[in-house]
């Protein structure tokens, strides 16, 4: 029990020192840096060209879906790499565990594919319009 607490104490001390070093560096830089704002420093820099328009551009949500799927499978590789290095020592049970892990991810990919989340060009939905009222007003209900 003492050895386990000692190991957790080492991890906690390592994390605490990491936070102290990051916060200390940030605070030291903030206190020592000169503050001389001017229009040239506050403008957006784009490869030496003057910025045109707004930087807030709407991106298609499909880019995010593709990026998330890439990250999921990239993390899968990170998890499977250590397993692959000691594959012969772990035996059959570890192989089954890795196959189940990969299978769950493949099922998730198949679900996203069947749902249509991976289709780059989606058909526009055909939404029927409300019939117009005889008085010329739209389909709003009157009370």
Curated annotation (Swiss-Prot):
It is a multi-pass membrane protein. It catalyses: a quinone + NADH + 5 H(+)(in) = a quinol + NAD(+) + 4 H(+)(out). InterPro entries: NAD(P)H_OxRDtase_bac/plastid, NADH_UbQ/plastoQ_OxRdtase_su3, NDAH_ubi_oxred_su3_sf. Its EC number is 7.1.1.-. It comes from the Bacteria. GO terms for cellular component: NADH dehydrogenase complex; plasma membrane. Its main location: membrane. Gene3D superfamilies: NADH:ubiquinone/plastoquinone oxidoreductase, chain 3 (1.20.58.1610). Pfam families: Oxidored_q4. Disulfide bonds: none annotated. GO terms for molecular function: NADH dehydrogenase (ubiquinone) activity; NADH:ubiquinone reductase (non-electrogenic) activity; quinone binding. PANTHER family: NADH-UBIQUINONE OXIDOREDUCTASE CHAIN 3 (PTHR11058:SF9). Belongs to the complex I subunit 3 family. NDH-1 shuttles electrons from NADH, via FMN and iron-sulfur (Fe-S) centers, to quinones in the respiratory chain. The immediate electron acceptor for the enzyme in this species is believed to be a menaquinone. Couples the redox reaction to proton translocation (for every two electrons transferred, four hydrogen ions are translocated across the cytoplasmic membrane), and thus conserves the redox energy in a proton gradient. NDH-1 is composed of 14 different subunits. Subunits NuoA, H, J, K, L, M, N constitute the membrane sector of the complex. This is NADH-quinone oxidoreductase subunit A. It comes from Pelodictyon phaeoclathratiforme (strain DSM 5477 / BU-1). The lineage of its organism: Bacteria, Pseudomonadati, Chlorobiota, Chlorobiia, Chlorobiales.
């Amino acid at each position: 029990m003492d050895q386990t607490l000692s190991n957790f104490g080492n991890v906690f001390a390592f994390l605490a020192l990491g936070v102290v070093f990051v916060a200390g560096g940030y605070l030291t830089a903030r206190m020592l840096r000169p503050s001389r704002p001017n229009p040239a420093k506050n403008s957006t820099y784009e490869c030496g060209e003057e910025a045109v328009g707004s930087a807030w551009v709407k991106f298609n949500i499909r880019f995010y879906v593709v990026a998330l799927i890439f990250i999921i499978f990239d993390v899968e590789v990170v998890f499977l790499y250590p397993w692959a290095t000691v594959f012969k020592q772990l035996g059959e049970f570890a192989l089954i565990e890795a196959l189940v892990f990969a299978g769950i991810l493949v099922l998730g990919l198949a679900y996203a594919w069947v749902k249509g989340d991976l289709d780059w060009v989606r058909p526009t939905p055909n939404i029927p319009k409300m019939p117009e009222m005889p008085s010329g007003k739209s389909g709003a209900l009157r009370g």
